[in-house]
């Protein structure tokens, strides 16, 4: 498996966006989850959390494991939601407050928007970068 080379990663995102655009009329969070999860072999979790009172609850996901839900606001997702900033965690074992739902998760990216957080975990260390950030923001804008 291993990390994707930047040019392959860009190409994969472009294909994913094309597929998602073709589904625009019936676009749902489940379709986005399934489309992207299927295209990136390293990912072991792709999901959307929604803010409910003082916690985040899973709304839609595709995963190797059942997700943790609800989760507190101290983990990566909660910090991303509260700061309204994208967070890239190269090594989740070194992130204070990381909530471990799957022991195979090695790195993570979170993208907050509206009352939600997109959370993606990878089996590879340092798997997320500016390419992921760029294309995931584009996908969020399509919702």
Where in the sequence are the language-model features?
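A short, aliphatic-rich beta-strand micro-motif
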Residues: 106-114
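Short loop/turn motifs at secondary-structure junctions and domain boundaries
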Residues: 40, 99-105
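Juxtadomain coupling helices with adjacent low-complexity linkers
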Residues: 2-5, 9, 13, 17-21, ...
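Histidine-centered metal-chelating micro-motifs
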Residues: 87, 108, 125
